[in-house]
Amino acid sequence: MDLVKSVAKTLLLYFLLQYIAFFIFFRFWLLPNNYLVIFTLVQLFFYCIIFFFLVKNKNLFYNTLSGEKETKVNIPNKITLLRITMLPLLVFLTFVSQKHMEKTSHTGRVILTIAFAMTFATDAFDGRMARIKKQETYMGKILDSASDYLLLGIITIAFFYFKLIKPWLFLVIIIRLFLNALVMLILSLVQKKIHPQTTVLGKIAIAVIMVLLVLEAAKIPVLLPWIRLAEGAAAFLIGISIIDKIVYLKRGLKSALPMDFHN
């Protein structure tokens, strides 16, 4: 029960902070009233899904080193949850900054860039903090992996819709994200358990995509040549990581299958 209360308090705090932030933007930019209504409904729906998922799987909140059950949401997991719950706000900020450029102008792009940069930056802290403090939980690993691909997948689609990224780059990123989800699904079915693991190249690919999306959101004129260069470098690294993920799948299947199937 203490864990459920901790989850509820954490999500309620994030909900209020994000709602207040959007309300400030809503009033400052004089947006249509239906935007606030839609954002509120989307937030409530999204948060309800997260809450029920966490409560239903509360038994996964255990320390992977000691096996001890968690009685509250630790700091690393709170950081991960913050990253996940930022999704609706990021999507709405992207929509507003592109759909109402005459109202948001330069300010909207700056806010959007800062929001993306701060959200993606949390990915560098939660896992590291969990390892240093020896607070790694099984649920934390699942959330960390899911947050990256959920955020990047939906944000990439939003960026493509508003022509913030090129079609070829969109395809490269989506193929990489889809392949990772497919690999996790296959290994989970074969191994009868979710193993949210990643490779070094996988981590690099995710970091590169995050940095690239921040640059694409900023679209600073003086940096445009460098952004084009970054797009090419990102596509190359993502392509290499796709091959790496296929190799990872092959190894995972080989270790999961009986010895008779290895030959």
Protein language model features and the residues they cover:
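Residue-level signature of catalytic and energy-coupling elements of molecular machines
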Residues: 83, 123, 144, 204
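Membrane-interface helix/loop boundary segments of multi-pass membrane proteins
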Residues: 127-135
